[in-house]
Design a protein with these regions (language model features):
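Active-site beta-alpha turn of Rossmann-fold NAD(P)-dependent dehydrogenases/reductases
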Residues: 37-41, 84-86, 151
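Active-site segment of SDR-like NAD(P)-dependent oxidoreductases
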Residues: 1-4, 42-49, 86-89
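Short-chain dehydrogenase/reductase
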Residues: 12-14, 18, 54-66, 94, ...
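NAD(P)H-binding glycine-rich loop region in Rossmannoid oxidoreductase-like domains
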Residues: 1-16
Length: 230
């Protein structure tokens, strides 16, 4: 469950995100999995409250999972890598507060107007790059409990819109509001140092792939409806 859904129902969010993660570790313990790779989030950096970045229930749950993983390793020798993806974009990334750049690309492909409700520097982590990082991680042999940031490319929302409009000059996509309340420029190097040099996508490559995918689905009559709510 992502940020808005955890905010709407914190108890359910905790059951899904925290208890659900514990269940994964318990199953690993029972059947003897060699390692676990799980998704944390950059939202965990909002803890403890009162710091530079926004605190959320979702971030609390993700930080709890990171500490849970450390204890499973210390007490039961279950190795794990927790990956904190920053702002993932690409086909089907259509829910959560950080999905708005994907929705903007979809809106352009479907000839719809859309205003991204934030601006400024932003992490652009293409879904293909995020998937590669997880695949490389689960293929790596290791014995400890690690947590790594996964940032992708740091670029402004405004420049992302410019790339989109180079593909479709008549696109009715804008941005407004404040800067996004999470760090846009974390380092991927510690993760790459452990697991190897997984594929990287530039912002331009990711936007082009995403836009063309939405266009293809539109032509096939299979493009999902635009989610302008959550």
């Amino acid at each position: 469950m992502q940020v808005p859904f955890c905010a709407a129902d914190p108890a359910l969010g905790a059951r899904v995100n925290v208890e659900g993660t514990i269940n994964v570790f318990e199953v690993s313990r029972e059947i003897g999995l060699r390692r676990i790779v799980y998704a944390s989030s950059v939202a965990s950096l909002g803890m403890p409250p009162g710091g530079k970045w926004k605190e959320t229930f979702y971030g609390v749950y993700k930080q709890a999972n990171e500490h849970t993983a450390y204890v499973y390793n210390a007490d039961l020798q279950i190795p794990s890598i927790g990956i904190r993806p920053n702002i993932v974009y690409g086909l089907t990334r259509d829910q959560g507060v950080s999905s708005k750049n994907t929705i903007a690309i979809q809106s352009a492909a479907l000839d719809e107007e859309y205003d991204i409700p934030y601006k400024g520097k932003y992490s652009w982590l293409y879904a293909g790059e995020a998937a590669s990082a997880f695949i490389y991680s689960v293929m790596k042999e290791f014995t400890k409990a690690y947590v790594f940031n996964l940032n992708g490319q740091c670029e402004t929302i405004e420049n992302g819109i410019s790339i989109l409009k180079s593909l479709k000059p008549e696109a009715k996509v804008t941005c407004s509001g404040q800067n996004f309340p999470f760090p846009p420029d974390l380092s991927d190097e510690p993760l790459r140092k452990l697991i190897g040099n997984y594929p990287t996508y530039s912002v331009e490559e990711g936007i082009i792939d995403t836009y063309n995918s939405f266009k293809e689905l539109k032509e096939l009559g299979r493009c999902p409806e635009i989610n302008k709510v959550n």
